[in-house]
Amino acid sequence: MSKKILIVDDEPNIVISLEFLMKKEGFAIAVASDGEEALAKVASFEPDLILLDVMMPKKSGFEVCEALRADPSKAGLLIVMLTAKGRDTEVAKGLAIGADAYVTKPFSTKDLVVKLKTMLGVA
């Protein structure tokens, strides 16, 4: 059974390219364009990993991460934060609230695939 990834970003071009790339790698994919939709998709799609943009409408990636980490049933869910703000304080905040990894935009798609496969144990 293929691993499931939820892509959460409000930039359509990023969503389209990530969705294409991850499907090509054999992952099952769902997408959400804001934080509220992300939380609903986690409940219905039950992903193994979330690629979560930090800056989004309705709920930020930080708020989504905090909500998921507060839910014991989501303890095994891997969260990778995506951001254009690569400042140390942003990275530290993301990791402190429970993100498993942090990727700064722009990123190498090849490196991202390697990172996700390693995290999901399918490398």
Q: Where would I find each of the regions flagged by the language model?
A:
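The feature encodes the CheY-like receiver
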Residues: 15, 56-58, 87, 105-106
